[in-house]
Amino acid sequence: MLAGLAGGRVGWALDAAQDPSLLEQRQAVLAALAQALNGGTVKRFRLAEALAGSDPEAIDDALGLWLSWLRDVLLVVEGCPERIVNRDQQAEIEAAARQLDSRDLQAAIRAVQAARAQVASAINTRMALEVLMLRLPPVTSPARPDPARPAR
């Protein structure tokens, strides 16, 4: 499973096999994304503030993981669940896929990519992250019906 979660980063997979705290950090980053998607504006801005206090490399890593997770949700929405990378998050990914559509996910992916580029170019990190938080779609709306399940 670590090889898949590493996303081609052999060094990370080897490090994670030796240091379980890397997996805990990964879970914390994904929990932050869940907070952003499920939270209101105030919660999102607090998260942006906390994330902005990290070093640029940590922010880039976090946003990269967010991209990977959002990509997996998009794959499920588009009917390709077998291609997801974050298999340890499959239940969460499927739940998000029932609440978001392809357009929302593509917009979220573009917003994360833009924030990542802005952080890399030393633009005001906190402002870039706040804009990202405003652009993420909410997943607190009622779940869409699962297309694989027949209607009752």
Regions found by a protein language model. Name each.
Residues 1-65, 69-85, 89-152:
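Charged, glycine-rich active-site and insertion segments that engage polyanionic ligands
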